[in-house]
Structure formats: structure tokens, C-alpha cells
Regions:
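Cytosolic regulatory regions of ion transport systems
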Residues: 345-346, 363, 369-572
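Transmembrane helical cores of multi-pass secondary ion antiporters/exchangers
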Residues: 2-412, 465
Length: 572
């Protein structure tokens, strides 16, 4: 009887432990995705809601204990997740943008990183009273910025000029640089404490070159292998996304095994090369990785913030805010203003970049990984999270205002993104241009693009449905006109316009089809507001321009009727 009772009790504890694990995992997923949804509804940086949710679930209520839940798996899971996030970020970069931003980007990634690291390390040493090793390590980690925070901010602000692509490139490329610097700084600081200054300097430079050399080489090889396999259709369509994910994990792991901490470099280079080749389409891969990254970022922030010790924040006292002020008011402005001297950037763009360096998931992950190698790890992680939370709050609440004050953003942009560059679309664009309204024509037809360029209209040879539209310089643009000859494309483009500018500013031509599409259109089930009225289909627009009708601009008044402008006027 006693034996039976012990057996039953043991089985019950196993069941309870299993249920606890399941509840915790479900809670992480629910809090992560739910926080993203709430942030999207409130139009605030999602990291703020994620941080609050993680703190409430972890140190406040004890609902989630990542160390008990995942044990030794915490750091490997964090590392692999960051690798996938950086791969996805690198796939949004376009090498063609380097023609305009190459020089300032190079200076930001070299001199700018060095200045940021030195100032932050000095602040950690003198303000936070860290020892030399921790100070140098924290300074290296804080050289990174948060692409997962910068991206949404840029989509909201839509700055004009070079600052948009420059901030995106810096945010993604500097992350593996910062991670590698942290590894080398940790080893170098330990060597310096052992009075091996010459060895520390030599090993640091040599290790940096080796890390980037091994990582870049393996990243290029992996991307080229994937390109060949996709081009020759060696991978079934339904397996392409999971296969690429497997390749990312394999490349990251293999690179780290070949040379310590070179994996992040490898996956970043892999994503960059894969995105900029022109032999196979990778749009579907990018969309899959974007969805996966959202899930990973959400879960990671919940896990990492749930591990925080809130008492460590209180222990800093005035030193925490003082260190944050140094990072925001001294380190970033100093690094940008000095590193961009003579790079051709206007002063307003340099000032804006000086106020845009939020830290995000990479800084949190790297700090959490290295904290286990240090004594007093909770204090080190708390210092990193002070900067993460502080920079997100400060930049998230003020960057939009500063961009408008500097003339880099418009509160109510009137520019128009036109999907298609056929003759009718060009006529509308020309009329808008004469009114000094910015226009941008997007088309995949080379003939239409050439004709638009010959007429002096800004053009982009791209698919309006491509995810890369999110990464364009949309400064001054505030609405979309979907004018293609395909009703379905117009509806989908209107959906993309709603993502960029909001549903209110997304327009499309009327539906010409009958049956289900007509019923959907009349019931409001289709995306986009109908431009000019339901009868204004592409066929009707094409007929009118074919008859010689032209586009004219007329000031509205109480005596003016819209029908007065609809005249069958032939051009002289």
C-alpha cells in the first residue's frame, strides 16, 4: 500500500511539473504576442509593453521563472533567436543604398563605434563604479543600436534625406560588430588586468579580423549554396522556408564552432548576400522570417525581463539616471558629430542621427549572455536594461517631434505613392508635381518606368506588393493611389498602403469585375477607399485618356462643382 502511494505521489508531481511548464510557455507566448498587439493599437514602441509585461510576469508576480523553466537552455535559445533576428534584418538591406550613404555609414561603424564604446566604458567605470572588465564589456555592448526599435520608429516618422537608410543600415550592421567587440573586450580586459597590455592589443585586433573573416566567408558560402539550390529547384516549395531557417541555424552554429562568436557575423552576411542577388526570388522567405522574428523578439523580451532583479535598479540610486544621461546626451551626439565630419551630411540630418540610438533585443541578449561569466551578474544586466528602457522611452517619445523641428519630417505629409506608371498614372503624377506635391511612381514594367523617367517623374522599379516597400525612403509621402490594370493587385496594394499610411489614406480604382468581387466591393470587404467613385475603373480611366481627356487642377469653391472639371478636353 505504501509503495502504491509513493508511486502515485511521484506521478502526480511529474504531471504538476509538466502542467507548470506548459502554463509558463503559454504565458510567454500570450504575453509576447499580446504586448505586440497592444503596442500596435496604441501606436507606441512595442518594447515598452514587452518590458512591462516581462517584469510583471517575472520579478513582480513570479508567474514565469525562465531559469527554472529552461535551465541551461536559456542562453543557447537566446543566441539562436538573435541569429535569426539579425538574418531577417540583413535581408531588408539594399546594397544600392550604399552609393549615397557608404561613407557616413563606414565612419559611424568605425570611429563612431569607438567613441561610443570609450565614453560608455568611462561612464560605467566612474559613474556606476564597475571594475575595468565590466566597464569595457558594458561599453562594447552599448555600441549596438536596436534595429527592432529603429525600424518601427522610421516607419512612423518617415524622414526625408539619407537618415532613414543610414539609421537602418547602422542598426543592423553594428549589432554583430558590438557582439564581437564584447567578446574581444572581455578577453582583452582580463589580459590587461594581468599586465599583458601588448598581448591584449595584438590579440584584440587579430581576433577582430579573424572573427569577421571567418564569419563573412561562411556567410557568403551559405548564401551562395542556398541560391544554387533554390535556382535549380532542389528544394520543394513547401520546404523552402524551414530549409532556410535550418541553414541559418546551421551556419550560425558552424561559424561559432570554427571561431568563437563569429556566428552573428556569418548570418548577417548571409542575409545581406541572399537579399541582394538577382537570380532567385526570396520575398516569401523574408515574409516568413519577419513573422518568425516578431514571435522571437516578443518571447525573448518576456524571458529576459522576467529574469531581472528589480532591487538592483534601486541600488544604483542617482547613478543609474546619470549614466543614462551620459549615454544619450554625450556618447551618441559626440560619436555622430565627430564621425560624420566631411561626409556630406547636412547639419539637420547629423543632429537627428545624434538623437536616434535606441537599444533593443541584441543589447539585452548579449548582456544576459555575458552576465553569467561575471560576478555580480544582476547588477551588470540591470545597468544594460536601464539604457535599453531609457533610450527607448526618450527616443520613442521625442524623435518624431525632433524630426519635424529639423525639417526632416512633415506632420501631415501630402505626397503620393502611385502604384503603376502607365500613361494615365503619369498624367496624374505630372499634375500633382506641378502643385509641388511629392510623387513616387512604382511599377514593374520597364517601358512604363523609362517613359516616366523621360518625363522627369520620380520612379522605382519594384513590386508594390513586395515587403521591401516598407524599407523605402517614404519621406514626404502620405497616401497611396493604386492605379494598376489589375483589380486584384489594386486591392492588395491598397492593403499595403493601409500598412504604410493608414486605411484613410489608401485609395484604389473601382472594381470592373462582376459576381463575388462586385458583391465584396459593394459590401466594403475589399481593402482601400475607392478613388473618384465606383465607376472609375481602370478601363474607364484608360478610355478617357484614350479620347484625349487631360488632368487639370482647379481650386475648390462654393460655386465650383466637381462635374465642371470633367470636360472632354484634348491637349493642344
Amino acid at each position: 500500500m505504501a509503495q502504491w502511494f509513493n508511486c502515485t505521489s511521484s506521478e502526480s508531481s511529474v504531471v504538476n511539473e509538466s502542467e507548470l511548464i506548459l502554463t509558463s510557455l503559454a504565458g510567454i507566448l500570450m504575453l509576447g504576442v499580446g504586448s505586440q498587439w497592444i503596442a500596435g493599437r496604441l501606436k507606441i514602441p512595442s518594447i515598452l509593453i514587452l518590458l512591462c509585461a516581462g517584469i510583471m510576469a517575472g520579478p513582480v508576480t513570479g508567474f514565469i521563472d525562465p531559469d527554472q523553466l529552461l535551465g541551461d537552455l536559456v542562453l543557447p535559445i537566446v543566441s539562436l533567436s538573435v541569429a535569426v533576428i539579425l538574418f531577417e534584418g540583413a535581408m531588408t538591406l539594399r546594397v544600392s543604398e550604399l552609393k549615397e550613404i557608404g561613407r557616413p555609414l563606414l565612419m559611424l561603424l568605425t570611429l563612431g563605434v569607438a567613441i561610443t564604446g570609450v565614453v560608455c566604458a568611462a561612464g560605467a567605470y566612474y559613474i556606476l563604479e564597475f571594475d575595468l572588465t565590466k566597464s569595457i564589456l558594458l561599453g562594447s555592448i552599448l555600441t549596438v543600436t536596436g534595429p527592432t526599435v529603429v525600424g518601427p520608429l522610421l516607419q512612423h516618422i518617415r524622414p526625408i534625406g539619407k537618415v532613414g537608410p543610414l539609421a537602418r543600415w547602422e542598426g543592423i550592421v553594428v549589432d554583430p560588430i558590438g557582439a564581437v567587440l564584447a567578446v574581444l573586450a572581455f578577453a582583452g580586459a582580463q589580459a590587461m588586468e594581468s599586465s599583458k597590455l601588448e598581448d591584449a592589443a595584438f590579440n584584440g585586433v587579430f581576433g577582430f579580423l579573424q572573427t569577421f573573416g571567418v564569419g563573412a566567408a561562411l556567410g557568403v558560402l551559405a548564401a551562395m549554396l542556398l541560391r544554387v539550390m533554390l535556382r535549380r529547384h532542389w528544394i520543394n516549395d513547401h520546404l523552402q522556408n524551414p530549409f532556410v531557417l535550418m541553414m541559418v541555424v546551421l551556419t550560425f552554429t558552424a561559424s561559432n564552432l570554427l571561431y568563437h562568436e563569429s556566428g552573428l557575423v556569418a548570418v548577417t552576411v548571409m542575409g545581406l548576400v541572399l537579399a541582394n542577388q538577382h537570380q532567385v526570388a526570396v520575398g516569401h522567405i523574408l515574409r516568413f522570417k519577419e513573422n518568425l522574428s516578431v514571435l522571437l523578439i516578443s518571447s525573448l523580451f518576456i524571458v529576459l525581463t522576467a529574469r531581472l532583479d528589480l532591487q538592483q535598479f534601486a541600488n544604483f540610486g542617482w547613478r543609474g539616471p546619470a549614466f543614462l544621461a551620459l549615454v544619450i546626451l554625450v556618447a551618441r551626439p559626440l560619436s555622430v558629430m565627430l564621425s560624420t565630419i566631411g561626409c556630406g551630411l547636412p547639419i539637420n540630418e547629423r543632429l537627428f542621427l545624434s538623437w536616434l540610438a535606441p537599444r533593443g533585443i541584441v543589447a539585452a541578449a548579449v548582456a544576459s549572455v555575458f552576465a553569467l561569466k561575471l560576478g555580480d551578474a544582476d547588477k551588470f544586466v540591470a545597468a544594460a536594461f536601464i539604457v535599453i528602457v531609457g533610450t527607448v522611452v526618450v527616443y520613442g517619445l521625442t524623435a518624431d517631434w525632433l524630426a519635424r523641428r529639423l525639417g526632416l519630417s512633415i506632420a501631415n505629409p501630402q505626397g503620393v505613392l502611385i502604384a503603376s506608371a502607365h500613361s494615365g498614372a503619369r498624367a496624374i503624377a505630372e499634375a500633382l508635381k506641378k502643385l509641388n506635391i511629392p510623387v513616387q511612381l512604382v511599377d514593374t514594367n520597364p517601358s512604363n518606368i523609362r517613359a516616366a523617367r523621360m518625363e522627369g517623374l520620380p520612379t522605382l522599379f519594384a513590386n508594390i506588393l513586395s515587403q521591401h516597400i516598407h524599407d523605402l525612403n517614404l519621406g514626404g509621402l502620405g497616401r497611396l493611389l493604386a492605379l494598376t490594370s489589375n483589380d486584384e493587385v489594386n486591392v492588395l496594394a491598397a492593403g499595403r498602403g493601409a500598412e504604410l499610411f493608414g486605411r484613410k489614406e489608401s485609395y484604389r480604382l473601382g472594381i470592373n469585375s462582376t459576381g463575388a468581387s462586385r458583391r465584396d466591393a459593394s459590401s466594403g470587404m475589399l481593402e482601400g477607399r475607392v478613388l473618384f467613385g465606383p465607376g472609375a475603373t481602370y478601363q474607364e480611366l484608360d478610355r478617357r485618356f484614350g479620347e484625349g481627356q487631360v488632368v487639370k487642377a482647379t481650386k475648390l469653391s462654393t460655386n465650383f462643382r466637381t462635374t465642371d472639371s470633367c470636360r472632354n478636353t484634348r491637349p493642344p
